[in-house]
């Protein structure tokens, strides 16, 4: 992932500023370990300098916990003097922010060492290292995300979220009503602005569907033949959705499980692989007989326990699991089966792909993709067989065997020899240190339920 030539960069900046003389500011964006977008806001007059020389940001940006505090045990904070690295623009990510009252653009960045090589702890680079292994095989990954979220009221009830009132009916939704078109109409202005904003920003969002809970929706991204770009789109789509919803006097949550007893938010990813001739190596009239497909699935299933910390990176992530919510809890696969971890849609022989259905919407897309592709590559190179596909309800046929809490998931990741071949062990150490720090803080907190149960009872 080399830095593009200076002339190419400046041409992009010049063309954009010429086309958009109204733009006053530019937000320089970079996604941290948690997928939280951070960065700087500059005046338009400084944009050329950013393209020419980059901007400095501390390496500790990739050692932040979910609250934005540096986790010193990572070694990226005070141990190195909280030193800067340099961030360069990612080509073709300069665009307008349609929600801003003062005309503002945005530009996605990636971090490098001062000498120019990519910084190992940038999640985008973590993914790039895995993608290079497919490049060496002459293979191209096609990928697309499905992103679930809740619209919520800007006013909480006793610190808990609640569905927003419909701008159309004035009522709060209370039923599931999956795929109900009328529920799309209840929030039509907000949802249409999301799709139109995505189009303006070049994000290939092609559909919104009503999901399985009150005011829960899913945006589908179209597949692209670049898994890093697919993750860029997912990160930027989350930011777009949050800001468009706020413009409509609502909030949004991508929390994995915001409501007890309701469906959680997932982040499913669809993956196919093209050979040098651009043909899908998974294409088959009979997917069970396609060796490449079987081996890819076999590798993903074998590494799934080690993927879990990246797929479900927060304490709340594990509250999402349950048969009634279509969240798989064992490493299994099936043909057109939504109860399994790896579903193979069977609509078209040319479009055969794997759908990875485990991750929550709170996952960092780059790390999610890196861990899944690590499994795919592991399976292809070692010809790992996945076993027979599950028919019917997998929850009745397979006991839960995936890690069901963050601590166990971190242990699986830390102990995985396979994952360490694909993701720099130094990065795994940093990730585990950050998540263990969050976990320790969580475990030392006292919940409202504990006070309700024990304060006056024991």
Each language-model region and where it sits:
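ATP/Mg2+-dependent ligation/transfer catalytic cores
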Residues: 1-210, 229-233, 398-458
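Catalytic-core signal marking the mid-to-C-terminal active-site face
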Residues: 2-3, 8-11, 240-243, 250-251, ...
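Flexible loop/turn segments at secondary-structure boundaries
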Residues: 33-38, 115-116, 151, 215, ...
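Short, solvent-exposed loop/turn segments at the edges of secondary structure
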Residues: 102-104, 144, 212-214, 264-268, ...
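Short, hydrophobic beta-strand segments
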Residues: 107-113, 217-224, 271, 356
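Secondary-structure boundary elements
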Residues: 133-142, 196-204, 237-253, 276-278, ...
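Histidine-centered divalent-metal-coordination microenvironment in nucleic-acid enzymes
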Residues: 148-162, 210-222, 255-277
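Short, contiguous, pocket-lining structural segments
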Residues: 182-190, 207-213, 226-237, 241, ...
């Amino acid at each position: 992932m080399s830095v593009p030539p200076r002339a190419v960069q400046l041409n992009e900046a010049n063309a954009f500023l010429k086309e958009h003389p109204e733009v006053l500011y530019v937000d320089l964006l970079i996604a941290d370990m948690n997928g939280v977008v951070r960065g700087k806001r500059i005046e338009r007059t400084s944009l050329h300098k950013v393209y020419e020389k980059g901007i400095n940001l501390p390496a500790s940006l990739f050692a932040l916990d979910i609250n934005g505090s540096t986790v010193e045990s990572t070694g990226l904070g005070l141990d190195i003097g909280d030193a800067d690295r340099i961030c360069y623009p990612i080509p073709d990510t300069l665009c307008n922010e349609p929600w801003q009252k003062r005309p503002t653009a945005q530009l996605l960045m990636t971090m490098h060492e001062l000498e120019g090589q990519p910084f190992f702890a940038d999640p985008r680079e973590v993914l790039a290292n895995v993608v290079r292994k497919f490049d060496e095989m002459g293979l191209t990954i096609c990928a697309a995300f499905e992103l679930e979220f809740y619209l919520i009221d800007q006013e909480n009830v006793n610190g808990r979220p609640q569905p927003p009132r419909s701008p159309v009916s004035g009522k709060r939704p209370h039923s599931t009503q999956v795929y109900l078109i009328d529920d799309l109409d209840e929030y039509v202005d907000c949802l249409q602005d999301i799709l139109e904003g995505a189009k303006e920003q070049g994000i290939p969002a092609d559909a919104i569907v009503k999901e399985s809970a009150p005011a829960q929706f899913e945006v589908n991204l179209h597949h692209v033949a670049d898994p890093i770009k697919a993750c860029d789109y997912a990160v930027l789509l989350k930011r777009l959705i949050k800001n468009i919803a706020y413009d409509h006097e609502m909030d949004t949550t991508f929390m994995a499980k915001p409501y007890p007893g309701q469906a959680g938010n997932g982040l499913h990813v669809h993956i196919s692989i093209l050979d040098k001739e651009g043909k899908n190596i998974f294409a088959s009239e009979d997917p069970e007989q396609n060796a490449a497909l079987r081996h890819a699935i076999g590798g993903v299933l074998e590494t799934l326990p080690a993927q879990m910390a990246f797929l479900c990176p927060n304490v709340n992530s594990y509250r999402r699991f349950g048969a009634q919510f279509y969240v798989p809890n064992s490493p299994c696969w099936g043909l057109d089966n939504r109860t399994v971890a790896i579903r193979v849609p069977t609509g078209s022989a040319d479009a055969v792909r794997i759908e990875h259905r485990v991750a929550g919407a709170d996952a960092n897309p780059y790390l999610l993709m890196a861990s899944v592709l690590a499994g795919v590559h592991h399976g292809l190179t070692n010809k790992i067989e996945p076993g027979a596909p599950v028919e019917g309800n997998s929850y009745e046929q397979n006991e839960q065997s995936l890690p069901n809490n963050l601590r166990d998931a971190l242990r699986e990741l830390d102990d995985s020899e396979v994952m360490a071949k694909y993701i720099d062990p130094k990065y795994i150490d940093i990730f585990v240190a950050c998540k263990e720090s969050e976990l320790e803080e969580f475990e030392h907190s006292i919940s409202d339920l504990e006070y309700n149960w024990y304060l006056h009872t024991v």
